[in-house]
């Protein structure tokens, strides 16, 4: 009823921002609703979990949500619309963004680990200055996206479409090789990267810029 009331009022007054500030703790989501930059109300929701024990935020329209908190863990955003969402937290772990729409998503985090972006799609996604540890980007389409100054460990970019994305000063620090097998890297910037091992087999590399500060790749 709270959500319905706010939705009805929102049709008359577009200054209400649904899910402006969201924090997640265990299986509870705390939401603050704002009107004209002031809190309209605050609510806690006990959320269902999926078969894997993840908080289930799949197939939802979460456009422009602002997720805050220390750690966001075990949340499924499967097939959700996350356009213009900001994640502002220390860490995101064991989350699933498979087939999610991620246009203009900003990750203001220190670390993402054990996160899945398989077949996620979007442009202008900002991962800059994050540690990306065991992140699966395979078969995703992340064009014009920002991986500047990331530390990338044990992550997979196979079959990705990364048109015009930037890895400026990224560090690829892995126990095993970083894999871009069969990815489309057209106009991707790998300038001043540090990389020890990598697999670029069968990639499209038209207009790629690659300058390596430290590498055993060759």
Task: Give the residues covered by each predicted segment.
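Tandem repeat scaffolds
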Residues: 15-218
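Extreme N-terminal basic, low-complexity initiation segments
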Residues: 2-5
